[in-house]
Amino acid sequence: MPRRGPVPKRDVLPDPIYNSKLVTRLINKIMIDGKKGKAQKILYTAFDIIRERTGKDPMEVFEQALKNVMPVLEVRARRVGGANYQVPVEVRPDRRVTLGLRWLVQYARLRGERTMEERLANEIMDAANNTGAAVKKREDTHKMAEANKAFAHYRW
C-alpha cells in the first residue's frame, strides 16, 4: 500500500450522447485494447436495439438492469487459525456499480447471439426483467453470503 495516503478516485467524463457517467463506465468496460470508438459504437447500437424492441428509453432500461444486477452482499476469504472462512460482507456502493457493470459485460460476451451489440442489448433487457446470467450471478453471490452467515462475526 502506498505510504502517501489513499489514491484518489479518478472521475470519468459523461458520454456525449446520454450525458451519463454510468454509460462512460460501461463503454470503458466493453473496450478492448484501447479501442474506445468501437466500444462506443457497440453500446450505442445496443441502445438503439433496446429502444426498437421495448419502445422505452434505453437509459431507463439500462438503469433498471443495473439495479437488478448490483449485489448487496458478497463473501470475502478470511484466514482464522489455519482455516479459510468465507465471511459475508456488505458491498460498498462504488463496488456495487463496478460489479454490476462488469457482470453485464462479462455475461453478454458469453451469450450466443451473432454480434456483441445484440448480446449486450439482450443481456441488458434480460437483466431489466430480472432474468439472464448476470442476475443469476447476483443471486448466487447472495446465496453464498446467506449460506456463510454463521461466519459473519469474523467481519473486519
UniProtKB/Swiss-Prot annotation:
Q: Name one GO cellular component term.
A: small ribosomal subunit
Is Nucleus among the key words of this record? no
Q: Name one Pfam family in it.
A: Ribosomal_S7
Instruction: Specify whether Ribosomal protein is a keyword of the entry.
Output: yes
> Which BP terms in the Gene Ontology apply to this protein?
translation
Task: Keywords in alphabetical order, please.
Answer: Ribonucleoprotein, Ribosomal protein, RNA-binding, rRNA-binding, tRNA-binding
What GO molecular function terms would the record report? rRNA binding; structural constituent of ribosome; tRNA binding
State the oligomer form and interacting partners. Answer: Part of the 30S ribosomal subunit. Contacts proteins S9 and S11.
Q: What does the similarity note say? A: Belongs to the universal ribosomal protein uS7 family.
Q: Give a short account of what the protein does.
A: One of the primary rRNA binding proteins, it binds directly to 16S rRNA where it nucleates assembly of the head domain of the 30S subunit. Is located at the subunit interface close to the decoding center, probably blocks exit of the E-site tRNA.
Q: What is this protein called?
A: Small ribosomal subunit protein uS7
Organism, by scientific name, is: Geobacillus sp. (strain WCH70)
Gene name in the database record: rpsG
